[in-house]
Amino acid sequence: MPKIVFFNHYHRGDLLTHKEFIRQVQTELPNYTYEYMHFNHPKLTRDLNIPLIGEPTNLDPKTPFYQEDGVLYINTWIGCFWDIFCQHGGINMNSLWHQWEKIFVQINDHFEVDLNLKEQKEFYLPSIDFNKFDVSKIDSYLKENTNKKVLICNGPPKSGQSFADNMQDFINPLAEEYPDVHFICTTKFPTEQKNVLFTDNVIGDTEVADKRAPWEDKEVNICDLQEISYLSENCNAVVGKNSGPFVFCETKTNYMNPNMKFLSYNVSWGEAFHTGEKKPTETMSNSLEYKCEYTIVPISDINTLTADDIANINQSLDTLVRSL
């Protein structure tokens, strides 16, 4: 039986953004064997129904394809297609689409088939099969709390997409001003506000895996990104830094929900950076047609927020909450 092994050496969001491309391959080539190799929690690719066979330790992270004994190994990391990454301004659906255009050519040549990408890039916005995960505690929280909810992905980005600060100095005053709104944060910080909640408490994930990724400084034992995604689809707004949990909230359901509001703090990158413009291009929303309200606030200095950055963050958060 023909066989394809997908592999990826990098972060969790890198595994999410390729799901619909992989699902198309699975659908159009149903009589193939599929396997996956990555360093992350096995939950991250569970809903693809592809066996996780280990880690790609012996494979080069910058090599896009391997062929061995008739098996095609496909690297799903966008960074191994550096020309595409740079041409389209970093990670966004344009760069992913053109990456998979090359992957489809390789699959077609290797197996003598005729896969074609769909022209509508919105088709490839990721979806998660939440039936594969325990979301019962989230459902209980949602049933007991019908007030407005803002999910804030306030942890540090893994790849320099935005500032690392946990935003407590922005969130605590905001929560005090709007006591009827729940602000659910993905990273804990000291607070006396009863309406500041944390995903650790709302989700209560207990599924532990003994994993250590080479780029982590601690064991990756718990992964609640799918559950955070589920929670996001039941919130009124999502705030984040274009990394980690925020990426898992950028689902097709949320993008096509006209009542959903996104607020993203991004650095400038790619062509916009080099021409002196401040419009960030490294965002999944770039050039897509979506129904949600998506606001990007550029961050000028991710190491030390400037006075303008601080003012823009405060103003954008207040504007967002007032609009709910």
Pin down the residues of each PLM region.
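Mid-sequence helix-capping/hinge segment at a functional interface
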Residues: I84-D165
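Nucleotide-sugar donor-binding patch of glycosyltransferase catalytic domains
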Residues: V247-L324
